[in-house]
Structures are given as C-alpha cells and as structure tokens.
C-alpha cells in the first residue's frame, strides 16, 4: 500500500469518527437505545409485560398511554427522589415514543431532578410556560439539541406556588414536545 492510499484511508476514518462524535450528545448518548429498560421499538405488550399492573388510556391528543406504578432511581438521585409512576406514550408507528416518570410533587424533588438534569445534559435550550397566567402555573425545561431524542423536566404549581406535579420525560419523537417552545440561550448577550 502506498503513502497516498494510507493517507486517504486515515483521513476518511478520522472524518467518519469526528462526524459521529459531532452528532452525539448527552441526551442521545444516554437514551439512544431506549429508556427505563425498554427499547424505543417496544410495543404495547412488551411495555405491559415489563411494567404490569398499569392502565391504558388516551392523552390529550388521543394517543395511547400506559401508566404503571414504579418506584425506581432516576438519574442516580437519592432514594427520596425515586419515580412514583411511569407513563408510556405510544407513537404513530405503534411503538414507545416517550416515557414520563412522575415524581413526588415537592420542591426538593423538582430541584433535584432539574439540577441533576443540568449536570448530566448541560443547560436546557428550550422552555415552555403557561403564558396565559399572570403567575405561571406550569413550566417545562427541555433539552432538544440531540433530536430526535428530547428530555423534558416539567412541573405544575397550585395558586400558592407549591408543586402539584413534577415530571421527567424522555422521548425519541421530538415533535411530541415541540409545540409552544421558546428557544433559550444561556450565553451572555453582548452590551
């Protein structure tokens, strides 16, 4: 093999390696194969077999959803911040499209999951708020850089500002969570 061929092979290998690294990100790295012990191509029966004792219903967009009680660790948080319930949303292709871990509704749980998500995935890059209210009653922080894989941490509060709901969602269909998003930047603006 001559030097030109060897050089071309090395250049091609480095290009492929760098292209793969450029498309990888913390959300994709963690959830590319699936979430909560199931692959993204899991169907209804596989979900129900892994998490028995749940119930099927429809979400607000008429998509099939399966919710089952499940106490397990989330993002290696301490035991007091375990999941309470997992809800699996079925996509248009009949497979798992997203999983929402419902947490105990408390400010410590919300802060723990937000802070750990920022540590693991970096700063969130999109947000959704209840803009109709004077004081926002719901907020969602999203990590969307690794589309189609998306992580969302959401909460809803009562009139006094106490959390009523704390959720951690991971999806492989970014379009499910794209509605009403406002992109945010954590970079300081030039004066």
Describe each region flagged by the PLM.
Residues 1-11:
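Bacterial N-terminal signal peptides that target proteins for export
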Residues 3, 23-28, 93-97:
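Short, compositionally biased strand/turn segments
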Residues 13-16:
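Core hydrophobic alpha-helical transmembrane segments of single-pass membrane proteins
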Residues 19-21:
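N-terminal signal peptide c-region/cleavage motif recognized by signal peptidases
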Residues 25-68, 100-191:
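Non-cytosolic coordination micro-motifs
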Residues 66-113:
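Mid-chain, structured segments of secreted extracytoplasmic proteins
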């Amino acid at each position: 093999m001559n030097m030109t061929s060897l050089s071309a092979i090395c250049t091609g290998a480095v290009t492929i390696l760098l292209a793969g690294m450029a498309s990888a990100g913390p959300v994709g790295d963690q959830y590319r194969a699936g979430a909560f012990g199931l692959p993204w191509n899991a169907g209804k029966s596989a979900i129900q077999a892994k998490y028995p004792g749940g119930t099927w219903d429809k979400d607000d967009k008429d998509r099939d959803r399966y919710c089952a009680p499940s106490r397990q660790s989330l993002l290696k948080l301490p035991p007091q911040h375990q999941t309470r319930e997992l809800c699996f949303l079925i996509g248009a292709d009949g497979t798992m499209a997203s999983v929402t871990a419902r947490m105990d509704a408390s400010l410590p749980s919300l802060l723990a999951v937000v802070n750990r998500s920022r540590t693991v995935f970096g700063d969130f890059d999109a947000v959704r708020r209840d803009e109709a209210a004077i004081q926002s009653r719901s907020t969602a922080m999203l990590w969307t850089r690794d589309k189609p894989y998306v992580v969302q941490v959401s909460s809803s509060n009562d009139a006094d500002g106490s959390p009523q709901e704390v959720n951690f969602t991971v999806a492989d269909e970014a379009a499910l969570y794209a509605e009403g998003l406002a992109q945010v930047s954590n970079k300081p603006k030039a004066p």
